[in-house]
Amino acid sequence: NYSDNSSMREYISYQIMGEMGLDVPECAYSHITVNGEEWGLYLAVEPVDEVFLAAHFADVTGDLYKPEGKGGTGADLVYNGDDISAYTGLNLKTNLNRSDGKEILALMQALEDGEGLEEVLDVEKALKYIAANVALANFDSYLGNTTHNFYLYEENGRFTIIPWDMNLAFGGFGGGEVDIYEPTKQSMGGFGGGDKRKDTQDNNAVTNAAENTEAQADANNQPQPPDNADMQGMPSMDSGEKPLVTTLLENETYRSMYEGYLKEIVEKYFTQEYMTELVTKIHDLIAPYVQNDPTAFCTYEEFEQACSTDPTDQYSLVYYAVNMAESIENQLNGGEPTFNTSSMQGGGFGGGGKDGPDFGGEKPDMASRTEQTADAQQNAQQNDRPAPPDQNGGQQGGQMDENERSGQQGGQMDENERTGQADGRQ
């Protein structure tokens, strides 16, 4: 994924959310070649379409929305009257010529009034969605300034929220302390805060990205600064009115349910044991492909550090889980946030993926990559993991089975691999 040295933030996020009972897309790691050209490792993500809806809902004839907060209104689900045409950011995806929007208007009205919510909303899944995104510090979502990367599906007048695009989870969107009771007012350290561990700091990636046009950013499938960002792309601390969060958490019963879901995450998923086992399993699967990826966003050494199972390594997913669990538990017991996610920020707009924007800096040549591999092999041995193959050593011991492959024949990607999601790049 873009701006993810571990190449597994999105995969793990979907796995946790799926185990919690949310409707999440299927995903699988894929090694892609196109007409004989190596494109490297991707995460193929199932599109939210008719096939997805049929797998998760009994009725597939309802309205599907993909709200987008940038340049439109309504994505925040704030009620502003009954003129559906005024909600330009809702983005209806189905029933384009048949829907009058009365169901989504009823949802927004209920969120404003705080009454009859369970008639128009799957409250349980909405609370799980909020809890998971809070724990994952995934603020490139409904919770953050961008107010996007989610779907709403209506079945018989009742909406279910569907997660989408989790590559900036684990604090990748902006560092700061996460207040579980006011998550939309989280203190953020900036949009894509620059990689402290790379020489590419000097390439002024964020500055150049701010000068990039919106059209170029869209074309390159890169995240864009929120509408209220300053010239450096620094968002304000308050993501605005978010009734899906505030209305639910103001209700004592729903607030208690939300706390229960956070406790579930702390006790079941954000343990050192669970995260170590999951990270190690994924690492051992994808490491040879990451090491030989011609379009990698980071060095192999940085990948190894992000996958470290040392709970004191501040750049690792295990470190994040252990410390976020402690912070959540402290707040559930009446205390304050204790964890700042700044160390988990990705590399901002930079990264240099396939056909991505050129923000300066050079991709490591084969000699430097070989030197990095030698260092990474030593680190892998210290972590009791299989060392990666050398540049000429093939990919023995790390082969993917058919479920993990891309399903391509003759080097061609199928539609799911192309569409999945725009920034599904590993």
Language-model regions: role of each:
Residues 24-31, 117-123, 141-142, 269-277:
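Surface-exposed patches in mature extracellular/periplasmic domains of secreted proteins
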Residues 1-2, 18-25, 37-136, 181-219, ...:
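Internal "kinase-insert"/substrate-recognition segments embedded within catalytic cores
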Residues 287-352:
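Histidine-centered catalytic/metal-binding microenvironments
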Residues 9, 42-44, 53-58, 139, ...:
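Short, solvent-exposed loop/turn and secondary-structure capping segments
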Residues 3-11, 94-102, 121-126, 248-256, ...:
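Soluble non-cytosolic domains of exported or imported proteins
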Residues 173-240, 339-426:
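Disordered, low-complexity segments in secreted/periplasmic proteins that are enriched in proline
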Residues 187-195, 227-282:
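A conserved long alpha-helix in the C-terminal portion of kinase-like catalytic domains
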Residues 118-172, 321:
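Active-site acidic catalytic loop and adjacent metal/ATP-binding pocket
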